[in-house]
């Protein structure tokens, strides 16, 4: 991945109101050297694969620069943990370029007893299931959403839903499209688009808050 400088200039605000969860954002930094160096230093303490952490940080930086969208990497990291354990579900891992070694399909790790039923939109083209849509990749993006928002970090490459770099950039773009994730309502609305269960939203918020410290 191209080495870049990343600036994170957001702070974390908390509230006692359960129904109004403040967006978890990283603490202020004047300058976070470069994504790779930054991720290398924090991968161990956060227990996030360095490749995944780099992907989350780059995606947050990219949407901030290109879309003026105040997402923050902790939200992407919290979703990555909740949806696939950062690409490590089902004995998978991320290879050197960020692609999972096992195709991750329909994981539903948060509530496996109640999988989402979604009508088919892609005839199995992305998810391999011609009967219904199932979420794909390390960030469990629905096929219809992937088709609309897919983005590749490398501009000359085809976006790959099984690659955490492309998946992070795609999910970041989607979250920015449904509201301002730098506000409580915008943040909650974005996460609800992934899983409308209020407990899931609170779960993601708690993890993102942990990463924000």
Where are these regions (language model features)?
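Catalytic glycan-binding domains that act on GlcNAc-containing polysaccharides
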Residues: 43-213
